[in-house]
Amino acid sequence: MIDLSTMKQQIATLLNQAIERLKTKGVLKPEVTPVIKITHTTDPQHGDFATNLALTLSKAAGMSPHALAEKIVEALPPSGQITEVEIAGPGFINFFVTEGSYQTIVSSILKAGKDYGRSEMGKGQRVHMEYVSANPTGPLHVGHGRGAAYGACVANLLNAAGFEVHREYYVNDAGRQMGILALSVWIRYLQGYEASIELPKNAYQGEYIIDIAEALKAKYGKQFYHSVESIQAKIPEEIDSNADPEAYLDAWVTAQKDLLGPKDFECVFQAALDSILNDIKNDLEEFGVTYDDWFPESRLVREGLIQEGLDLLTKHGYVYEKNGAQWFRATALGDEKDRVLIRKNGLPTYFAADVAYHLHKFNQGYDQIIDIFGADHHGYIPRIRGFLKGLGKAPEKLHILLVQFAILYRGNEKVSMSTRGGTFVTLRELRHEVGNDAARFFYIMRKPDQHLDFDLELAKSQSNENPVYYIQYAHARICSVFRQLKTTQKNWDRPRGMENLSLLSTNYEKELLATLGRYPEVIKRAAMNYAPHLLAHYLQTLANQFHTYYNAERFLIEDDNLRNARLNLINAVQQIIRNGLTLLGVSAPEEM
């Protein structure tokens, strides 16, 4: 595969050979080991590639950067792909490559097709990725959508770079919030029989709770019914619902468990969990986000993984008892305070579950483990790295990526969200309003740790201001050229076009060729830096260059040789746009 990174490697080889020659001549000492950095220039007048090698080695050589640059250039071996080498400024070395070097990029793209840009950079390396993992207590909201789009794109990029990626969703099916969910459904169920019963203000309020309750009533009738009086009798009188609403809520959960008993409580609990989890799965699948595994927290208890983690931390001396609870000595490993692992009632904390889950991940032998969290989890990072050290695991294998929640604007008005309050805008509602493509692209077009103001009106607009529309329109325009071709007496001879790529000599064409050649390098950089926004920006640049070219030139011309060369070029642009959009989870429509 020919691309600009290949050309950079070839230039680096030439520079290494020049350095070795200078060592032989005594200009540089034998122990000098240069780090050769080559960049692609933005101004064609300064060539195609540049290096600051002379500036970095001037001190070791005992001469000015410009003087050393002259000696490096003199020592460069000849190359059939380099037409000119010049020294600029204080000692930068600029390289001009042959036009043929760029033109071979077109043939490489058309030959590789959908595989152009893929590499074996990560061959043999296994990566575990966990993302979204929202509590199954309600539908996904627009905040979760950004983590979903980002995680899916990073997984796609790593896969394109040759890594074997395992995608996982951690299902928190064993925590306090799940008890509150089951309670919320049960009270809505009871309201079908007694209107006087009130839902505690901190319970889940959304309409989806009523839907689950009605389904429960339709299937089981009055099996779970208990009177208001019997419930109130279970609530301690000293608990004030206004003074301590959370304690009041916990008392309700305890009352529910006592009155229903284990079997019926599990039935209500499972109905709520299954309904919401199925909705989450369907929502994500419709959004193009799929997983290899949905890992339930309850499995950690069932398979003894929490106890395994506790035993390992104890073995390494990081567990102690205080006030009837078992604590992790987190401060000894860089955290701000020690953390409770097992409460005095014998129940594990969320923290204990996280220890067990990460121990399980590390025990699978992955080369990289990636956790994608909301930015509000930033304080959790030292905690996780601390317990990994306590477990005797290598913290450097873990990469925690933080994603800022997207802020949705309807007009100039900010939309607030609260899962328990039921006032949130769901991911499904967003997708239905702006479409999957706009949602996927808008979510990832900024760095993940930057705040994202999601402009609904812009996302729906069919204008050049809408970046995803602009990119898709470039693809559709190219498709229209080939449809128009079929209505004429002209033909497209791809082999003949390959033979005449040298005719692609306008500045528009040279610019497009150079940008096409950058695509494989963009994929590698985006994968290694977990940065899909780099690919989004690249596609915007490519689309802009194509639209400029489209407006300036004609393609279905009488000159057979030039026509075929240009059709090959725009076919290559079409392929790269389609490849890039696919990695971002965005469609490439043929008509718009």
Curated annotation (Swiss-Prot):
Its EC number is 6.1.1.19. It catalyses: tRNA(Arg) + L-arginine + ATP = L-arginyl-tRNA(Arg) + AMP + diphosphate. Gene3D superfamilies: Arginyl tRNA synthetase N-terminal domain (3.30.1360.70), HUPs (3.40.50.620), Isoleucyl-tRNA Synthetase, Domain 1 (1.10.730.10). It is found in: Cytoplasm. It comes from the Bacteria. A motif ('HIGH' region) lies at residues 134-144. It is an enzyme of class 6 (ligase). GO terms for cellular component: cytoplasm. Keywords: Aminoacyl-tRNA synthetase, ATP-binding, Cytoplasm, Ligase, Nucleotide-binding, Protein biosynthesis. Coiled coil: none annotated. GO terms for biological process: arginyl-tRNA aminoacylation. CDD domains: Anticodon_Ia_Arg, ArgRS_core. GO terms for molecular function: arginine-tRNA ligase activity; ATP binding. The keyword Methyltransferase does not apply. Its main location: cytoplasm. HAMAP family: Arg_tRNA_synth (MF_00123). Belongs to the class-I aminoacyl-tRNA synthetase family. Monomer. This is Arginine--tRNA ligase.
